[in-house]
Every structure is written in structure tokens, then in C-alpha cells.
Design a protein with these regions (language model features):
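Beta-sheet-rich sandwich/jelly-roll-like modules and their strand-loop junctions
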Residues: 22-115, 121, 129, 141-151, ...
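Beta-strand-rich extracellular modules
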Residues: 155-157, 326-330
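C-terminal segment of classical bacterial N-terminal signal peptides
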Residues: 13-23
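Extracellular calcium-associated, cysteine-rich motifs in secreted modular proteins
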Residues: 201-231
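A short tyrosine-centered beta-strand micro-motif
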Residues: 303, 319-326
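Glycine-centered tight-turn motifs at strand-turn-strand junctions
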Residues: 266-316
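Extracellular and select intracellular beta-sandwich modules with Ser/Thr-enriched
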Residues: 211, 334-339
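Aromatic/hydrophobic beta-strand junction motif of beta-rich domains
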Residues: 80-84, 243-250, 256, 307
Length: 344
């Protein structure tokens, strides 16, 4: 007999209305076009109790052909949907999960091997409503990283979340539930289609937030708000006998170079080394690096860095020099500043 969920109970549980998936999202899993039927695998005798339901096959549009490839792309699952209810007049607590699953023998549909990949949100599925005409689709927010090929899974006890007909072997039951860090485990207990669906959004910067609905700046992994396009400010540069002092407006990685002034000639907009061919070109000053560059992890505010021994003033030949500072913040914004000094 078809059972359903109370819409009012769903709203009270904090579930979202079911919107259309955004254009940038990829939806995979069940088409959710059936009510749960002949389900309740976790409560089957002789050992009723918690279990993990791992989907292996889902029918796909347009013709309902069986698909066993799991997630078609990598990214972040930002929402998932379940068509289910709690049996026995009680609400069901379920946990959204991802697993890797395969059939060791492709010709044997009776057994599969699975490994838990990650746990997602734990949510409450209201009890069945015998007066309702169909089971509504429940949608929940999430933020779960997914890799291409991962399969949808659900942990529960008194939950009806599959549709079983015609002997379909689309989902495998693991009892007790799969455990994080545990190796592959086999199962010969199977069921029909798992009524779970998920939306995957791209995650271009790899920060674990969906680029469409959760991340305002998909190009910078250090922020999920507005993009940081402000370069760090560099000021107060002072080159001492043994150390360098400077100030930063924000924390930044700093690269430092000592460069010496050399005479040059301007050729096609650049200051080149003087040669016989360009000796009549306009004069200019070119800066030539001395020794190796060195670096510092600069903090916001005042900073001090020891200068390598070979680059200290006492060990430099007389002439005009500059300290070139390049500061790059966590978002990749860069500022270059220099401070001239003379060695006599």
C-alpha cells in the first residue's frame, strides 16, 4: 500500500521547498518518480536494526535505462532529495552518505562490495501519513565533496526509501552500517531503487563550497564571500646594515631581491645592456639582481627580516642599489615596491 508524508511535518522539520536545479548544477540519482514500496530493508528479520543502503543502479531519462556510473562529475553536493517515510508510525532519522561500490563479478547481480567515502547531513524523515495520496519529495541543504564515480547512500533504521518491483537488484544493504576508515565490505542483500537524488555544483577553487549557490568567489579558495581584489599595501621600507624593516596592510608572502644599478640604453621601450650597436640610444638605469632572492612570511603591520650575510651592505661593492619587495596575499594579489640605498 502506498504511504506518504505529512506536508506540515516536513515544513516543521526545516525542509526546503523543491526548486528547479540551477543551470550550473548536475543532478544525479533517482528520478524520484515512484513512491516507496515493499521497502523497509533495515527492519527485516532476523536482525532488524541500522543499516546502510548503497545505490548501485538508477534508471535514467529518457527511457529509464539502468545506469551504474555513480556521480557523473566531481564537485560539491549542495542539496539532496529523498522520497521516503518513517514506518511504524514514527519518524526516521537518516544520514546522507557517499560510497564506492562495485560488483566483483559483473555477471553476478547478487553481491557487491562497498566502501564508505564520506558522511553528509543527518536529517529527520517524518512518519507516514495514511491519509495522503502520495509521498512528497523532501529537499535538504548540504555541503559534501563528491568525486566522479561516487554512489549515493543512506543510513537509517525504520525508513522506507526504496521502491522494489520485478526483482530489481539496484541497491545493496550493508548491516551493520558501513564505517568510515573501514576497508571494503561485501553484501549479498539487495533491494530495488534507492529514492535519493543529489545536485552537484562545480568547485573550481577546491574550497569545498559549491560555486553556484555557496561561493561568491569561485576563483579564490581563501574566501566564499566577495572576491578579494585588493593588493597588499607595502610601506615603511628601511634597509639597515643587517636587517630590513617594512610594513604590510595584510599578511602576505614576501620575496626580496637586492639589485644594483647599471648603465643601459633604452631600446624599444626597455632598458638594455649597452653595446656598440645601441650606444647612441637614450641612457637609462637597469637593475641587475645581486645573489639569490630571499623570502619572508609577512604579517599585517610591522615586519623585520634579517638580510643574508652576502647581501649586507658591508659585503656589497660600492654603488647604488635597491631592495625590491614583492608581496603576494593569499588571494594572489601582488604589490611591488622598492627602496634605494647606496654603498660607499
Amino acid at each position: 500500500m502506498t504511504r506518504a508524508l505529512a506536508g506540515l511535518a516536513a515544513a516543521a522539520a526545516g525542509m526546503l521547498a523543491l526548486p528547479a536545479a540551477g543551470q550550473a548544477a548536475t543532478t544525479f540519482g533517482s528520478r524520484l518518480n515512484h513512491d516507496p514500496a515493499n521497502s523497509g530493508e533495515c527492519m527485516r528479520p532476523p536482525n532488524p536494526g541500522p543499516c546502510t543502503l548503497v545505490s548501485f543502479i538508477h534508471p535514467i531519462d529518457p527511457n529509464g535505462d539502468p545506469y551504474s556510473g555513480g556521480a557523473p562529475v566531481s564537485g560539491v553536493i549542495t542539496k539532496f532529495r529523498i522520497r521516503a517515510f518513517g514506518e511504524g508510525g514514527a519518524a526516521a532519522t537518516v544520514t546522507f552518505r557517499l560510497a564506492d561500490i562495485s560488483r566483483p563479478d559483473p555477471n553476478n547481480q547478487n553481491s557487491a562490495v562497498a566502501t564508505l567515502v564520506v558522511d553528509g547531513p543527518t536529517v529527520t524523515i517524518p512518519a507516514s501519513d495514511p491519509m495522503a495520496t502520495e509521498t512528497p519529495i523532501l529537499e535538504f541543504p548540504a555541503r559534501v565533496k563528491v568525486s566522479q564515480g561516487n554512489h549515493l547512500a543512506l543510513d537509517g533504521t525504520n525508513v522506507w526509501a526504496t521502491v522494489n518491483n520485478s526483482g530489481d537488484k539496484f541497491t545493496y544493504v550493508f548491516q551493520p552500517p558501513l564505517v568510515a576508515g573501514q576497508g571494503p565490505r561485501g553484501s549479498t542483500d539487495n533491494a530495488g531503487e534507492l529514492l535519493v537524488q543529489a545536485d552537484i555544483e562545480p568547485d573550481a577553487d577546491g574550497d569545498g563550497f559549491g560555486d553556484e549557490s555557496q561561493d561568491q568567489c569561485p576563483s579564490q579558495g581563501t574566501t566564499q564571500g566577495a572576491c578579494d581584489n585588493t593588493a597588499p599595501g607595502v610601506s615603511g621600507i628601511a634597509v639597515g646594515a643587517r636587517s630590513l624593516r617594512y610594513r604590510l596592510s595584510e599578511a602576505a608572502s614576501v620575496t626580496l631581491k637586492v639589485q644594483k644599478a647599471r648603465p643601459g640604453r633604452r631600446v624599444r621601450g626597455k632598458c638594455r645592456r649597452q653595446t656598440k650597436a645601441n650606444r647612441n640610444r637614450p641612457r637609462c638605469t637597469r637593475w641587475v639582481s645581486v645573489g639569490k632572492s630571499f623570502s619572508d612570511d609577512g604579517d599585517a603591520g610591522a615586519n623585520s627580516k634579517n638580510i643574508p650575510r652576502l647581501l649586507r651592505k658591508a659585503n656589497l661593492a660600492p654603488g647604488l642599489y635597491r631592495m625590491l619587495i614583492t608581496a603576494r596575499d593569499a588571494a594572489g594579489n601582488e604589490t611591488k615596491r622598492s627602496k634605494r640605498f647606496r654603498v660607499r
